Amino acid sequence: MFYHLILMLAVLDPSVGIQTQQVAAANQPTHFTNYAAAYREAQQAKKPLLVILNPADESSAVKVEEVRNTQQRRDLLQKFVVVVIDTSTDHGETVNKLFNEKSLPHVSVIDRDQQWQLFRTSKKLQGEDWNRVLETFQNGEQTARLNLDVKLPCFT
């Protein structure tokens, strides 16, 4: 399956979809809108790839700005290459087919060698969920595991 994903990258136009964040904070990561460009950047930088597949309905879409709303997450996101795909476009439809995902929005983490999908969910991620995902997969190691259905103990 993943071999087909790599094969399809050759079909996608890598010259489209690099969207740099023009913000005051220089420490924010580059945000890609083209999967092929993000894939190549992650491969070159040896960083895990955080893929967000968004639906056409913006009200249910994952908003990267909201994910970045804490310093902890901004710091963690620097360890990833982030790509946000609008699945209502031709490019987005193609990428969504590669992931074979019917439930949107969808979040996936690809390892730092771009060979394995380490994590995937269509669950609506809240603040602590994002913290756990980003902390667990920040090194892009294939041995990392996370089950968001397991609640962490709260010591009082």
Question: PLM features: residue spans?
Answer:
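Solvent-exposed loop/turn segments at secondary-structure junctions
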Residues: A56-S59, T87-H91, Q114-W116, K124-G127
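Non-catalytic, surface beta->alpha helical segment in thiol-disulfide oxidoreductase systems
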Residues: V67-R68, K102-L146
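Typically the conserved alpha-helix immediately C-terminal to a functionally engaged Cys/Sec
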Residues: Y35, S60-L76
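Structural alpha/beta surface segment adjacent to cysteine/selenocysteine redox centers
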Residues: T94-K102
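N-terminal leader/targeting and pre-domain segments
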Residues: L7-L9, D13-A45, D129-R132, T136-F155
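Thiol-based oxidoreductase modules, predominantly thioredoxin-like and allied folds used
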Residues: A26-T33, L53-A56, R73-G92
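Positively charged n-region of N-terminal signal peptides that target proteins for export
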Residues: M1-H4
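Short active-site neighborhood of thiol/selenol oxidoreductases, capturing the structured segment around
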Residues: A45-S59
